[in-house]
């Protein structure tokens, strides 16, 4: 075998291994979402923050929050639930997803930003502090900058 054949064969083998790993991870994630305890989801009620609060609604099921983050839209889990019952057997969620969520910073409130046009800006207008522009000085500055030329050298 030549070196090129070995490199190509190794690349194909590495690609197949990576695709197998991705397929196994996707299957495990599908099983995890499908095979959760049904009682925990049906018994827990989500608080209705949309009506009573200015904060977005949060899921009460912390496994969904840890895996996907908080979502303000309805979950597609209920539609796929019938299909998952035939595929899955009961198993526990991975241990790395069971850590408690981090604290909410800034008290959990949103920070409002204003643009410059929204803020009331008062400029200090003291005409007495402004200096009168001297025309001689202005022409001297123009000449000083117009005389400067770039010098190029061979490298």
Swiss-Prot record:
Keywords tagged on the record:
Membrane, Transmembrane, Transmembrane helix
Cellular compartment(s): Membrane
Which cellular components does GO assign to this protein?
A: membrane
Query: Topology versus the membrane, per the UniProt entry?
Result: Single-pass membrane protein
What sections of the protein cross the membrane? Answer: 6-26
Q: Which domain of life is it from?
A: Eukaryota
- Where is this protein primarily located? membrane
Q: Name one Pfam family in it.
A: FAM163
Q: Which InterPro entries match?
A: FAM163, FAM163B
Q: What family, per the record?
A: Belongs to the FAM163 family.
What's the name of the protein? Protein FAM163B
Source species of the chain:
Xenopus tropicalis (Western clawed frog)
Its organism's taxonomic lineage begins at: Eukaryota, Metazoa, Chordata, Craniata, Vertebrata
């Amino acid at each position: 075998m030549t070196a090129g054949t070995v490199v190509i064969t190794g690349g194909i083998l590495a690609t197949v291994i990576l695709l197998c790993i991705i397929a196994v991870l996707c299957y495990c994630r599908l099983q995890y979402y499908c095979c959760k305890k049904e009682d925990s989801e049906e018994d827990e009620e989500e608080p209705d923050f949309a009506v009573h609060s200015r904060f977005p609604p949060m899921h009460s099921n912390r496994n969904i929050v840890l895996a996907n983050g908080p979502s303000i839209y309805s979950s597609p889990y209920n539609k796929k639930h019938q299909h998952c019952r035939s595929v899955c057997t009961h198993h526990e969620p991975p241990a790395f997803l069971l850590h408690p969520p981090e604290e909410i910073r800034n008290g959990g409130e949103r920070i409002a930003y204003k643009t410059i046009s929204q803020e009331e800006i008062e400029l200090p207008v003291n005409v007495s502090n402004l200096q009168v522009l001297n025309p001689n000085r202005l022409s001297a500055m123009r000449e000083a900058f117009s005389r400067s030329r770039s010098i190029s050298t061979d490298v």
